[in-house]
From Swiss-Prot:
InterPro entries, per database record: Beta-prop_EML-like_2nd, G-protein_beta_WD-40_rep, TFIID_NTD2_sf, WD40/YVTN_repeat-like_dom_sf, WD40_repeat_CS, WD40_repeat_dom_sf, WD40_rpt
GO cellular component, one term: SAGA complex
Pfam families listed in its UniProt record: Beta-prop_EML_2, WD40
Predominant localisation class: nucleus
Keyword terms, alphabetized: Chromosome, Nucleus, Repeat, Transcription, Transcription regulation, WD repeat
Bilayer-crossing regions: none
Organismal lineage: Eukaryota, Metazoa, Ecdysozoa, Arthropoda, Hexapoda
Record-given protein name: Protein will decrease acetylation
Family recorded in the similarity comment: Belongs to the WD repeat TAF5 family.
Length: 743
């Protein structure tokens, strides 16, 4: 037996030798792989360990290691301009979470530092308010602190521009039952004077603050295009080196970390000596097409600049291109042709004419604005109407919507109607004020009626005494001087069995209403002056009434401690509003018709839902009986007055007292708001009238007594001592004329 040959079969079936051969082949294949693959794998493993990538598979396009010079320059520029997503920075959100008072404290101290500077520096530093306030607001929303964000914006919005406190729209639901405090929105509106400055940067941040005030959730705010653009990159701010040095020294001394991080993260401060950039709306919104040049000199030449003078006015400065164009080159000859001289003269004349036209237009605009301001500040004097009562006891009065007739109620159960002209009326024969006047309360004169009334009056003259007959004749032949109306003019309506407490013309129908101490309400028609309906539901005297702004409904207040809602089609009350502990002295409908306010002798004002009778608000700030109520035309405020010598104004949305109007000499007998929601007229029982400017109101502070007394003279526009012993009603007509009725 022969053994196998070593030379032929030495390593044929040996598994060891076969593995060694495979390893050698794999090693040769690994040597062929490039260095980029090795680096890519190493970088991928490092990024995976640091959790910088989310995918497990690495592609070649994910880790591109080779770039040309142009791509490297572009990426470098993007890295410097954009905020790096993987870079770790100090986060304001982590600090202000559950600690929103830190933002208020640091921003408040920064504002005190700015306001303490000199005038030029203060005007320049105030430009930091807008971006800082907006970014702090968004950071607080991101930290889930909406209440702190709302308080911060509401507290410091006036630093950006003057805020108009009462131009903000009301919340969607006045009762506030279905929305919580965190979900309720507020809106900031800046004053009209601040919107006419012509400063593009200021207008941009005013619009941004107004937009942010409507959002209390970060997701909703970031969905807005303006907010998203503002938050997408750093805001470029041009200022002087003095301002930057002052702010840096202050931050180093105080150590306000939140402000320093905000300036580092969201602001790009560019120092320009004695110059700053002229911001336009396109620059602020990033809509310009101009690109920065590669050379530094071209960049300086292409940028327009403006000069900041000591008063803070921004004036455009001459660019380097304009200066270079005005320089005469050395190669240009000094000899000019006659045609060139004529062309230069013509261009100079046209430039002067254009400047003159611009000056004329500016003067006309200034004159127009000044005229508008004068007319706006001018106050029209009121018109006084005096009723001679002769111990009849005048209790109430009112004017019709056409302002041509007057209605009065007396304590002797009489209701009397006059027309507002200087001629007297006898019986039902009303003299027409104008031939083509259309008024439902005005009747045509008839000869037969005049003869009948003459005969009736002659019979009455025979029955009356000589003194009464002399008084009648004097009243008939008199022209009612000084707008005085007595019992012999007009037409008397009889029906109540006790004294009349309140009367009212209907604003929607040719009707009028009257309530009396006999616990009834009567409705009178215009075409025949007869009683159309009698409404009975109260058990005690009725003191007041008011008609719904949408018609069909009337509300009354009574001595039975309740207010009741009536429909003109039913003789019994629909809803009873019970809750007061004493007489309901006054009632008022909200301008939208959905709410009713009641004032009582129990020193409280209550707000009710008109349809359900549910109690919405209780204002218990009054110290004496409330006898007068008046809603503002926009429905945001409620004025209450009575036996106190002050008027209290309540904010319906907040459910708290907003301000007080003092300086009254007696109890207030009537209130009335102007149609444009600017003035409030108050009439006193001693015959004095006061007009208040509501736009100048300031919110009540902790020491409200001192603040209210000091602001009383500034808010008061007009004080008039009428010839009446007492005023019973003030009324703004459709012609915006203020009528005052007294006796």
């Amino acid at each position: 037996m022969s053994l196998p040959s070593a030379s032929n079969h030495a390593h044929a079936a040996s598994p060891v030798y076969s593995n060694s051969n495979n390893n050698k082949s794999s090693a040769s294949s690994k040597k062929t792989s490039s260095k980029n693959d090795l680096l890519r794998c190493a970088v991928g493993l490092l990024l995976k360990q640091k959790n910088y990538v989310s995918n497990e598979r690495f592609r070649r396009s994910d880790f591109l290691l080779l770039q040309n010079k142009q791509q490297f320059a572009v990426n470098k520029m993007l890295d410097t301009d954009l905020h790096g997503g993987n870079s770790f920075t100090f986060s304001n959100v982590q600090v202000i979470t559950n600690n929103q008072h830190t933002v208020d404290q640091q921003f408040g101290r920064f504002s005190q530092f700015v306001e303490a500077q000199a005038e030029p520096l203060r005007l320049e530093m105030k430009r930091f308010y807008g971006p800082m306030l907006c970014h702090f607001y968004l950071d607080l929303l991101k930290a889930r602190e909406p209440r702190g964000a709302v308080e911060l914006l509401r507290k410091y919005a006036h630093l950006v521009a003057p805020v108009d406190m009462y131009d903000a729209p009301p919340p969607t639901k006045i009762n506030g039952c279905s929305t919580t405090a965190n979900e309720s929105t507020f809106n900031i509106r800046f004053a009209k004077e601040a919107q006419d400055t012509g400063d593009t940067e200021l207008d941009y941040f005013m619009r941004l603050v107004q937009t942010l005030s409507g959002y209390t959730r970060l997701e909703a705010a970031e969905s807005d295009d303006t907010v998203a653009h503002f938050r997408s990159s750093k805001y470029e701010l041009h200022t002087t080196a003095v301002v930057v040095n002052r702010i840096c020294a202050y931050l180093q001394r105080r150590g306000h970390v939140l402000i320093m991080n905000l300036l580092y993260t969201w602001l790009h401060v560019h120092i320009v000596e004695n110059e700053q950039r002229a911001f336009s709306e396109d620059h602020l919104l990033g809509l310009t097409d101009d690109l920065e040049g590669e050379d530094g000199e071209d960049d300086v030449v292409s940028k327009p600049a403006v000069t900041l003078n000591t008063r803070g006015d921004i004036r455009p400065s001459k660019s380097l291109t304009e200066k270079s164009n005005r320089k005469r080159p050395a190669e240009e000859p000094n000899i000019m042709l006659e045609t060139d001289i004529k062309q230069e003269v013509e261009t100079d004349e046209s430039a002067e004419l254009s400047k003159l036209q611009l000056n004329i237009d500016a003067c006309l605009d200034t004159l127009k604005s000044a005229t508008e301001q004068i007319l706006k500040s001018q106050v029209e004097l009121p018109r006084f109407l005096r009723i001679s009562e002769r111990s009849r006891g005048l209790t109430s009065a009112h004017l019709d919507p056409s302002e041509c007739h007057m209605l009065a109620g007396f304590d002797n159960s009489a209701v009397q109607l006059w027309q507002l002209n200087q001629s007297y009326c006898r019986g039902k024969s009303f003299y027409r004020r104008y031939p083509q006047k259309r008024c439902p309360w005005e009747l045509n004169n008839c000869a037969n009626q005049e003869e009948e009334t003459d005969e009736d009056s002659s019979d009455e003259d025979v029955k009356c005494s000589e003194e009464e007959r002399r008084e009648r004749n004097r009243a008939r032949h008199c022209k009612y001087a000084d707008n005085s109306y007595n019992e012999y003019g007009g037409f008397q309506l009889r029906g109540h069995t006790k004294g009349v407490t309140d009367v009212r013309f209907s604003a929607h129908y040719p009707l009028m209403y009257s309530v009396s101490k006999d616990a009834t309400m009567r409705c009178w028609r215009a075409h025949n002056l007869h009683c159309a309906a009698i409404y009975r539901s109260h058990n005690y005297p009725i003191w007041c009434l008011d008609e719904s702004p949408v018609g069909q409904y009337v509300v009354t207040g009574s001595k039975d401690l309740s207010a009741r809602l009536w429909s003109l089609e039913k003789e019994h009350a629909l809803i009873i509003y019970a809750g007061h502990t004493q007489d309901v002295e006054c009632v008022a409908f909200h301008p939208n018709g959905n709410y009713i306010a009641t004032g009582s002798a129990d020193h409280s004002v209550r707000l009710w839902c008109a349809t359900s009778g549910k109690l919405m608000r209780v204002f218990a700030d009054c110290r004496q009986a409330v006898t007068q109520l008046a809603f503002s035309p926009d429905g945001k405020m409620l004025a209450a007055a009575g036996e106190e010598t002050k008027v209290r104004i309540f904010d319906l949305a907040a459910g708290a007292q907003l301000a007080e109007l003092k300086d009254h000499s007696a109890s207030i007998s009537s209130l009335s708001w102007s149609t444009h929601n600017r003035h409030l007229a108050t009439a006193c029982s001693d015959g004095t009238l006061r007009l208040w400017d509501i736009k100048k109101l300031s919110p009540m502070s902790d020491n409200s007594s001192a603040g209210s007394s000091s602001s009383a003279t500034t808010n008061r526009v007009l004080t008039v001592n009428s010839s009446c012993q007492r005023l019973v009603d003030v009324f703004y007509g459709t012609s915006k004329t203020l009528y005052c009725i007294g006796t």
